[in-house]
Design a protein with these regions (language model features):
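Nucleotide-activated donor-dependent transferases that construct or modify glycoconjugates
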Residues: 1-22
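Short catalytic helix/loop segments, enriched in acidic residues and glycine
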Residues: 18-38
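Conserved N-proximal alpha/beta basic substrate-recognition cap immediately N-terminal to
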Residues: 37, 47-145
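Active-site nucleotide/adenylate-binding loops and adjacent lid/helix of ATP-dependent enzymes
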Residues: 117-198, 204-213, 217, 231-246
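ATP-dependent carboxylate/phosphate-activation module, predominantly the ATP-grasp catalytic core
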Residues: 192-256, 268, 279-306, 323-327
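A short glycine-rich, hydrophobically flanked beta-strand micro-motif that places a catalytic Asp/Glu
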Residues: 258-270
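Conserved protein kinase catalytic/activation segment
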Residues: 272-274
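Cysteine/selenocysteine-centered motifs that mediate thiol-based redox chemistry or coordinate metal-sulfur cofactors
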Residues: 308-332
Length: 332
């Protein structure tokens, strides 16, 4: 199989604008982790793309943007020469959905979630509505035309289609959240702050079943009203009573079209897990799966392309937690 891997930020998606350092660093981490796994698979010939402002990737075939070529055109060129494409991109602005649709439009194999599933999970409000309709516990999510309940405590205001902690703001109460929504009514949502450990799930989905690969602890810093993800402890939390595997199954049933690697952000409250958002793509936790579990997650994903394959559901391996730092050498 000829496979084209496209990491949007480090792979040319910002070729016509300045590279955002934090996003480029995180994207490069995910890309290198995935390429290392793919490099072990017989019969898989991988090509990627590279922003020429970044160091080259030794031993990896990479294409670079041509004069005037934007990220979408670069992706189309790479996918056209391959049998399958694996896009990794922020959901923001519909970027990931557009890449997925282009892949299928070209008649190529998409190693990722369906465009419709990406479109749904891109919107935090739509995701919350879909999960709530299926009885999955999730954080209440409000837009500018909703009446915010006067719940005590701080609230979070964020872009409805945001990725990670980008532009996430913590405000002191529901009134401040309401005012923030009014200031930018088209793009923002507000959610009450949920107390409890910030965790995430790494899932393997096939559109029908789901396998819980790991439960990860997120090390989050809140300062000056800004929320920052500083590090992740991959496979640092055990699913002792099976409630997290059960949550994964309920999410997969509620959101058809999730396929391949999927991330879930949630808070573990005293009443149980509460979902914050679904990431229909590789997340940074992927970078620690090999060290923590001794598995090749890329092999598991591509194995789902084989005829009559189905995801198995063994419990997460015990393993040893792996620590993935998102801080730069400058400590940001």
């Amino acid at each position: 199989m000829n496979l084209f891997v496209f990491e949007f930020v480090s792979g040319g998606g910002f070729c016509d604008k300045p590279l955002p350092p934090a996003l480029a660093r995180e994207g490069d981490m995910m890309l290198r982790g995935l390429l290392a796994d793919l490099g072990e698979l017989p019969g898989v010939c991988t090509t990627t793309s590279r922003d020429p402002r970044l160091p080259p990737l030794p031993g990896v075939r990479a294409i670079v943007p041509g004069p005037g070529e934007d990220g979408a055109a670069l992706y189309a060129r790479g996918a056209a020469a391959a049998d399958a494409a694996w896009p990794i991109a922020p959901e923001t602005g519909g970027v990931l959905e557009a890449l997925a649709r282009e892949t299928l439009h070209m008649g190529k194999i998409l190693a990722g979630c369906s465009p419709d599933a990406i479109r749904l999970t891109t919107s935090k409000r739509s995701t919350a509505c879909a999960l709530r309709a299926s009885g999955v516990p999730c954080v209440p999510t409000f837009a500018h035309d909703d009446v915010l309940p006067p719940l005590p405590g701080p609230w979070v205001v964020k872009p409805d289609d945001g990725a990670g902690c980008d532009h996430v703001i913590l405000v002191p109460d529901w009134r401040a959240a309401r005012d923030r929504l009014a200031a930018d009514p088209r793009e923002l949502v507000a959610q009450p702050w949920i107390d409890g450990p910030a965790l995430s799930l790494s899932l393997l989905c096939d559109g029908r079943g789901v396998r819980l690969l790991s439960c990860n602890r997120q090390h989050v810093r809140v300062a000056g009203g800004r929320v920052t993800l500083e590090a992740i402890g991959v496979n640092a939390v055990a699913d002792r009573n099976g409630q997290l595997a059960q949550l994964a199954g309920r999410i997969a049933a509620a959101l058809p079209g999730l396929w391949g690697y999927v991330g879930v952000d949630f808070v573990l409250t005293s009443q149980g897990p509460v979902v914050l958002e679904i990431n229909p793509r590789l997340t940074t936790s992927y970078c620690g799966l090999r060290q923590a579990l001794g598995i090749n997650a890329a092999a598991l994903v591509l194995g789902l392309l084989e005829a009559d394959s189905a995801v198995s559901s063994p419990p997460p391996a015990a393993g040893t937690p792996a620590f993935v730092s998102l801080a730069s050498d400058r400590g940001d």
